[in-house]
Design a protein with these regions (language model features):
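Intrinsically disordered, low-complexity Ser/Thr/Gly-rich stretches
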Residues: 1-183
Length: 183
């Protein structure tokens, strides 16, 4: 993570937020999975991998994943703090290989693997663990035009409608390397 963790809330003075200071997880283009407050400290150490089963209306799009440590409200931070632990992205055209581009058939379900940087963190009792799935994490990653045109030479932009699947045939999940607590 370049420059360390960032609070996952927009600032009213940031041009991309347009005065909206809600948490990024409150956006309607972010799929959120969040635990209840943890009953005990939980150590996560190692590689973080997200497996997604997804389809898109576009021939190319991005899928992003972000692991967040959600701090409860406190005197210093009355609304709490949402600190990103790790994040990453997969461009659909490179879902099977970074060397060979392969566009999607719109509406077809594909498996995607998003590998985040390894981490070592103890999520403290009372905190929540959150995973955000989206199709963009700008400005950290460049925007996908969703058209399938050659990268950086696109002449048009398209809105992609993406679907994430989570059922026995399409088990989307995150692999968290939990280290058992010692007594």
């Amino acid at each position: 993570m370049v420059n360390g963790a960032l609070n996952q809330r927009c600032r009213s003075d940031y041009w991309a937020c347009k005065g909206d200071v809600r948490p990024l997880s409150a956006r309607n283009d972010v799929l959120v999975f969040q635990t209840s407050p943890l009953q005990a400290d939980l150590e996560v150490t190692g590689r973080l991998i997200v497996k997604l089963w997804a389809s898109s209306s576009a021939p190319d799009t991005d899928f992003t994943a972000k692991l967040t440590d959600v701090y409860p409200p406190s005197n210093d931070f009355p609304t709490g703090v949402d600190l990103n632990v790790a994040d990453s992205i997969i461009r659909a055209r490179y879902r099977t290989s970074r060397e060979k581009s392969e566009l999607m058939t719109p509406g077809q379900v594909y498996e995607f693997t998003i590998e985040m940087y390894p981490t070592s963190l103890v999520f403290k009792k009372g905190h929540r663990i959150r995973v955000d799935i989206s199709s963009s994490n700008f400005p950290r990653f460049d925007v996908n035009p969703n058209t399938g045109e050659p990268l950086n030479r696109n002449r048009r932009w398209a809105v992609a409608t993406n679907s994430i699947y989570h059922d026995p045939q399409h088990p989307s999940h995150i692999e968290l390397p939990v280290i058992p607590a010692t007594k």
